[in-house]
């Protein structure tokens, strides 16, 4: 992401390591050597270990302060190439002291592939029983740093908190992280299942939330759709054009094909793409911000760019979604078997058929009328037709007494 300059989220959320079913993780991890957390990755291959602003210990409210110490382990990575595999930028994984591949080391022991870290108040002579992660039961946890973060040569991929994942996909990701060189051997499998992974997972999140009782009332859904425009959100059962207006090609708003417009959040592609959307802090502090005073008020523009690296396992999937949904109005996914909406079909079937002869006469008559118009009248007529097309999309939004409110998404 181009927001890589931002090294931490503020304020940092409380991290709860949780099972897919929502239960609390065990005090002792399962089999294997998988880290509880996602990795740090070098932006440029230097081989230099990361340095940290702050403690360097990832946030985890499940771990007592005295046990908030551990190490970052170097994971050498490779990619296939002519003449054999070639090294790429290193990844680093965090383990608590006494766990993981170097669980036999004492805190501070010298090792070229280890960086020791501890939080304020931690006692490195005491080791907790937090173990390592069982990839068949637990997901990787997102990295969050309350006290700063790694230096500017390191980044980490965005992972939403409380995300839903299948057990199989969790296991694949964890094994990839834990084995040297396995990133390349598993890449083919990841590419082949990329379409099933991200979109299906996003759709399952919505279904699971509904099963767990996190339903939204009709009143709440309407309230979400009627907020100030920049604070609105799509609730289940709402069409995109009902909340954010009709889609247009080549100008805002232009994201969404007909399937996404109709289904809203039920379309897993929408939830998947939210992974690329900046947080309010990132949007404000990582954007090119311009402000112009116009007759109708102050226009503030935020220009933000999110970069999906080509080596990202979901790169092909994000590219496909963008191909389908950027300027996608009037189209549907090629593999979508869904026919046109029943309401539209019903309207067409119930409408009386117009004889071809009558339709031809009507068009012919219109052409005769238009041909009798002067050039000036034709220009005026075209403008009127254009205005009719966009009457439901106001150029100016009436915010009421103030442009901002206390409601946050």
From Swiss-Prot:
Q: Give the span(s) annotated as Disordered.
A: 1-64, 167-197, 327-409
Query: What does the record give as the function of this protein?
Result: Packages the positive strand viral genome RNA into a helical ribonucleocapsid (RNP) and plays a fundamental role during virion assembly through its interactions with the viral genome and membrane protein M. Plays an important role in enhancing the efficiency of subgenomic viral RNA transcription as well as viral replication.
Q: Name one Pfam family in it.
A: CoV_nucleocap
All copies of the CoV N CTD domain together span 217-333
- Note the HAMAP family from the entry: GAMMA_CORONA_NCAP (MF_04097)
Q: What is this protein called?
A: Nucleoprotein
Ranges of biased composition (kind: Basic and acidic residues): 176-197, 332-349
GO CC annotation = host cell endoplasmic reticulum-Golgi intermediate compartment; host cell Golgi apparatus; ribonucleoprotein complex; viral nucleocapsid
Q: Which organism is it from?
A: Avian infectious bronchitis virus (strain V18/91)
Binding partners and assembly:
Homooligomer. Both monomeric and oligomeric forms interact with RNA. Interacts with protein M. Interacts with NSP3; this interaction serves to tether the genome to the newly translated replicase-transcriptase complex at a very early stage of infection.
What SUPFAM superfamilies does the record tag this protein with? Coronavirus RNA-binding domain (SSF110304), Nucleocapsid protein dimerization domain (SSF103068)
Region (Dimerization) residue ranges read: 228-335
Q: Does the keyword Disulfide bond apply?
A: yes
Q: Which GO terms describe its molecular function?
A: RNA binding
What domain of life? Viruses
PTM description: ADP-ribosylated. The ADP-ribosylation is retained in the virion during infection. Phosphorylated on serine and threonine residues.
Q: What is this protein's gene name?
A: N
- State the family named in the UniProt similarity comment for this chain: Belongs to the gammacoronavirus nucleocapsid protein family.
